[in-house]
Amino acid sequence: MKALVDTSLLVRYLTGDPPHLAEKAAQVLDGEETLGITEVALVETAYVLESVYGVPRKEVVDALLALLQKENLRAVGGDKDLWMRALLLCRPSRRVSFGDALIWAAALASGVKRVYTLDARFPEEEIAVGPPEDPGPG
């Protein structure tokens, strides 16, 4: 692998906007070169597509799933299968953020049974979530 891709390249590729940059992005992503993608780029791309471009959640997830299935794209510092599982978790609901879904999937994959969070919307499927228990007075 000679290069990683960043959010701007992914957004141009997925939106086609603006066309001259989308074409450059397509040349890179649709080429033969093996490329790396990070979890940060994935989460940022999801955020930009949803919040800046107004793409519906299901379409964002479907686009990112298709992207992750590209043969020449490798996960750097993560696991593509885990990322896809997280995306599928947040596809049907705006309640679960992409970031929280990735944390949830990482907990499941690593065998961790609890996630400390103060977020009432954190996914609870198959794990315990909530604030740390108060240890009481010193």
Listing of model-derived features with the role each one plays in the protein:
Residues 73-113:
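Active-site neighborhoods of divalent-metal-dependent phosphate/nucleic-acid chemistry enzymes
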Residues 104-138:
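Acidic, PIN/NYN-like endoribonuclease modules and their adjacent C-terminal/linker elements
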Residues 39-47:
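Short, conserved active-site loops that position catalytic residues or coordinate cofactors/metal ions
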